[in-house]
Amino acid sequence: MGRVRTKTVKRASKALIERYYPKLTLDFQTNKRLCDEIATIQSKRLRNKIAGYTTHLMKRIQKGPVRGISFKLQEEERERKDQYVPEVSALDLSRSNGVLNVDNQTSDLVKSLGLKLPLSVINVSAQRDRRYRKRV
């Protein structure tokens, strides 16, 4: 079983990341020295725990957004994703020979919105193909 991290360690690490994200790295030793310079931490053991959890969170941030932590770069990235507009519209009739191929649900949605689009309804099976071979 792993060790339990206290609320103090988690709060301190999140605060460090939100304020000093550009200075932090994926290296524990570097983060430990940075914790020493930035914060006044009572004990060496607590400093090491905070630096370790900070390093752990930095590795998670590299993979994707982490719940409870927001910093400027992450906010900008989220904003860009929200403002994304595809180059080619899914409703562009010139690319699909004047008819859109949709399933039953999408067809109902288009009708409820009151859009007058030429639709071709395609039956979609409820089950997807298995990605892997079934174990015997």
Curated annotation (Swiss-Prot):
<comment type="similarity">
    <text>Belongs to the eukaryotic ribosomal protein eS17 family.</text>
</comment>
<dbReference type="InterPro" id="IPR036401">
    <property type="entry name" value="Ribosomal_eS17_sf"/>
</dbReference>
<dbReference type="GO" id="GO:0005829">
    <property type="term" value="C:cytosol"/>
</dbReference>
<keyword id="KW-0963">Cytoplasm</keyword>
<keyword id="KW-0689">Ribosomal protein</keyword>
<protein>
    <recommendedName>
        <fullName>Small ribosomal subunit protein eS17A</fullName>
    </recommendedName>
</protein>
<keyword id="KW-0687">Ribonucleoprotein</keyword>
<comment type="function">
    <text>Component of the ribosome, a large ribonucleoprotein complex responsible for the synthesis of proteins in the cell. The small ribosomal subunit (SSU) binds messenger RNAs (mRNAs) and translates the encoded message by selecting cognate aminoacyl-transfer RNA (tRNA) molecules. The large subunit (LSU) contains the ribosomal catalytic site termed the peptidyl transferase center (PTC), which catalyzes the formation of peptide bonds, thereby polymerizing the amino acids delivered by tRNAs into a polypeptide chain.</text>
</comment>
<dbReference type="GO" id="GO:0000028">
    <property type="term" value="P:ribosomal small subunit assembly"/>
</dbReference>
<dbReference type="InterPro" id="IPR001210">
    <property type="entry name" value="Ribosomal_eS17"/>
</dbReference>
<dbReference type="GO" id="GO:0002181">
    <property type="term" value="P:cytoplasmic translation"/>
</dbReference>
<dbReference type="GO" id="GO:0022627">
    <property type="term" value="C:cytosolic small ribosomal subunit"/>
</dbReference>
<comment type="subunit">
    <text>Component of the small ribosomal subunit (SSU). Mature yeast ribosomes consist of a small (40S) and a large (60S) subunit. The 40S small subunit contains 1 molecule of ribosomal RNA (18S rRNA) and 33 different proteins (encoded by 57 genes). The large 60S subunit contains 3 rRNA molecules (25S, 5.8S and 5S rRNA) and 46 different proteins (encoded by 81 genes).</text>
</comment>
<dbReference type="InterPro" id="IPR018273">
    <property type="entry name" value="Ribosomal_eS17_CS"/>
</dbReference>
<dbReference type="Pfam" id="PF00833">
    <property type="entry name" value="Ribosomal_S17e"/>
</dbReference>
<dbReference type="GO" id="GO:0003735">
    <property type="term" value="F:structural constituent of ribosome"/>
</dbReference>
